């Protein structure tokens, strides 16, 4: 169990003036001196809790909480359409269903060419990723589940849309026109370009058509501003600088109920500071006025001959869109991952931001960025970007990935590291605390019981009622948890 130093107060908390700039869930933040810490109240201490599915302890949670796991792919899981459920459960969102149930639309981050899962016509007959949709009770009992998108690749995160759909993101730029990615597996057999976003209606089927004008890059997550009808997008370009983007549809999706493919993609730049290095450590409460630079060619197709290895390398292709923005002054970030919109603010995570500047543009073998996490907030109406948090100490925060907001404005962060993985809460008062600890053990290892403590959490999302937190274990043998209990009592 981690020490009290893990429950540190926010180092980059806003001052009173900064809070007024930000508003929203973090308007209550107050400045804390560097190094200030605070022990979480005793009722937040984590303890082993048995899974309602079978009595096994898979999570440590605060007192009074329960959970049920489902769709555990250590064993074969058949969906209602006959599909064998793939693993790599990743980003996810929850929507209202009938009879008090919840629709989950869940990503499966499967890479490399191969046969798609599920029925119907896939986007790419050699794409193994996609989404599944699950109707589930608030306490984690599955009513039905089916394939809702197939034939994609590396479906990482995404974001919920207020009209009732999920935008799923491909974290790759693979295709027949691009050389092999980090796995070394040839892309020659792929039939479509990848690196796009797709829309999936809750409880329904995706039309399997990519929204290409929203960019072909290593997409991670999206967050939608219903006031202006603008979609904000994060990029997780592992070995190179990443960008923060916005996509402005030609028609307001709040009126049409869907994203169109005729919009404009733009990249964030800092006013007066071309190519601002926001991946490196920033001053406390750093605040920037931003502008947006256009991406002229958001969905490139590179020259290739079918059936032959493409001359364009993966490293060349994966920076193509971002380089257009950086040529016009776009800002450098480190590995932008989860994003969430709340009350006029887009919150997003930089997984390796906050450390010393990188010595080169890349590729960087252990990832671009030398910190262990930054949390940024972008005020959409004021076009102001503010740093909420940064650290180089994994005992404070260790590589934040997916993020969601609770009904009370607390951020729930999924850690993605090679050691113990936690869900962390970040309150409006600026307190960072442990919310859940992975204590999963394999049931199929030899002998059984091998620890899987470094399997990451992903896809945290609250039910529409706010009573249940659904979250995934992202691993080749994935699963989903429904966690419920006295959230208000612990300030989540």
Positions of the model-derived regions?
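N-terminal secretory signal peptides and thylakoid transit peptides that target proteins
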Residues: 1-17
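Conserved small-residue
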Residues: 12-492
